[in-house]
């Protein structure tokens, strides 16, 4: 089994936290130099992976929000969204309480489309490792 690790990229550490918890194969789309070939590979992986995970840790993850809603419509049974409020290096939380409500609405929308919605990386890892 393989999972695509989509979602927030810029200055987010969630992949470093999740990857050691996974007992399955994964595709990490984050690269230092994004090219059209990288975009093509990402689209291929979203099609071929057993699950596509979108973890949102910042409210400005607008493209990731579009991707998760797109996938929750096109392939709801293999789409997972996780909204988690990451702690920044300065000790503050990355997402305000108001913005958490907005992202929660995105998660609930994806869930209504038939996708899975989790609120922690632990829940995501437990689910994927038990599939």
Please provide the spans of the model-predicted regions:
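Conserved catalytic or regulatory cores that recognize and/or transform ribose-phosphate-containing ligands
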Residues: 1-131
